[in-house]
């Protein structure tokens, strides 16, 4: 356990930040999954509404990823890789349709 007041405070701060980061990462993963579900639904049944739904989900995921990168929850390259993967999935389905 921490021996000094400052060390104790750092333990408390790091725990607070860990929980905050965990919530952010969870939200990012949830939106990525929703985006991939929307993309696969569009791939199974191509329609203008499906494409719009997939693009909306992609936009929401991009926004959350960018905010996580801005708050240093995700590394810049990790965020870019996640966004590129989502864009690639939508592009692949769009070209097949």
From Swiss-Prot:
Physiological role = Binds directly to 16S ribosomal RNA.
Tell me the NCBIfam families matching this sequence: S20
What is the protein's species of origin? Microcystis aeruginosa (strain NIES-843 / IAM M-2473)
Taxonomy, top ranks, is: Bacteria, Bacillati, Cyanobacteriota, Cyanophyceae, Oscillatoriophycideae
Recorded GO MF terms: small ribosomal subunit rRNA binding; structural constituent of ribosome
The membrane spanning regions, by residue number, are none
Q: Where is the composition biased (Basic residues)?
A: 76-85
What PANTHER family does this protein map onto? 30S RIBOSOMAL PROTEIN S20, SMALL RIBOSOMAL SUBUNIT PROTEIN BS20C
Q: Which GO terms describe its cellular component?
A: cytosol; small ribosomal subunit
Q: Which gene encodes it?
A: rpsT
Which family does this protein fall into?
A: Belongs to the bacterial ribosomal protein bS20 family.
Q: Which domain of life is it from?
A: Bacteria
Q: Which Pfam families match?
A: Ribosomal_S20p
Q: What is this protein called?
A: Small ribosomal subunit protein bS20
In its UniProt record, which GO terms are filed under biological process? translation
């Amino acid at each position: 356990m921490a021996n000094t007041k400052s060390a104790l405070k750092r333990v408390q701060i790091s725990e607070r930040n860990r929980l905050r980061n965990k919530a952010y990462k969870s939200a990012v993963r949830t939106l990525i999954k929703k985006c991939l579900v929307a993309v696969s639904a569009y791939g199974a049944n191509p329609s203008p509404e499906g494409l719009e739904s997939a693009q909306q989900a992609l936009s929401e995921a991009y926004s959350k990823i960018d905010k996580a990168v801005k708050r240093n929850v995700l590394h810049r390259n990790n965020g870019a890789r996640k966004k590129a993967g989502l864009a690639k999935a939508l592009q692949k389905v769009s070209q097949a349709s």
